[in-house]
């Protein structure tokens, strides 16, 4: 019994596979409040365990957009420990574990990380993207459901875990409304044996000075 307990997989392992050779292709569709639309494809690949970090081995994942991530999985959940962009010489360790899924995998489990804006823009400033001025915004994640059914171009998936992220960014909306708390909402679906299958992001602005959008 002790041997079997030692071999038990960390919570959430089947919902976010880390083993080498896995590959995901995502179609991203973004739409802004001014009716602008963009389409792109992003590919994520698992490269297996490596020892690039001073803190020890971790699972290496790479995006074709030029971003690398290192993750670990244990009894507390699945979390990122470092990241690297094309302009970084070395991986940058996260100050604290950045959870993707936190144990227990149960409705109500919550945790905090940071996010930024991906869609919201100012209408008359350069650069227009809000993220340049607000690179880190606190976001609270909560597991909302354990048995969602999700249908995407790759197929239909069941028994999926739905996670909601909510952040508030205080911005000057316009002279009439002044400063407003802008909600940044993310929904993510993780499905057994597959991983992340769907993401929805909403950044509404409803302002004459700002343009929001959905992804």
Predicted feature residues:
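Sec-dependent bacterial lipoprotein signal peptides
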Residues: 1-5
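Conserved functional acidic sites
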Residues: 7-215
């Amino acid at each position: 019994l002790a041997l079997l307990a030692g071999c038990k997989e960390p919570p959430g392992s089947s919902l976010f596979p880390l083993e080498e050779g896995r590959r995901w292709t995502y179609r991203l569709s973004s739409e802004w409040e001014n009716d602008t639309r963009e389409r792109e494809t992003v590919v994520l690949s698992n490269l297996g365990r490596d020892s690039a970090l001073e803190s020890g081995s971790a699972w290496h994942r790479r995006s074709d957009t030029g971003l690398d991530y290192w993750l670990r999985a244990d009894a507390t959940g699945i979390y990122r420990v470092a990241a690297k962009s094309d302009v970084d010489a070395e991986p940058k360790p996260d100050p604290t574990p950045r959870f993707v899924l936190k144990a227990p995998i149960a409705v109500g489990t919550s945790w905090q990380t940071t996010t930024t804006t991906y869609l919201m823009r100012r209408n008359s400033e350069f650069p227009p993207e809000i993220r340049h001025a607000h690179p880190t915004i606190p976001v609270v994640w909560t597991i909302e459901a354990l048995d969602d059914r999700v249908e995407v171009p790759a197929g239909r998936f069941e028994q999926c875990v739905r996670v909601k992220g909510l952040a508030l960014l205080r911005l000057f909306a316009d002279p009439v409304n002044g400063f407003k708390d802008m909600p940044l909402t993310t929904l993510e679906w993780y499905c057994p044996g597959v991983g992340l299958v769907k993401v929805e992001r909403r950044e509404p602005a409803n302002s004459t000075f700002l343009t929001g959008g959905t992804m």
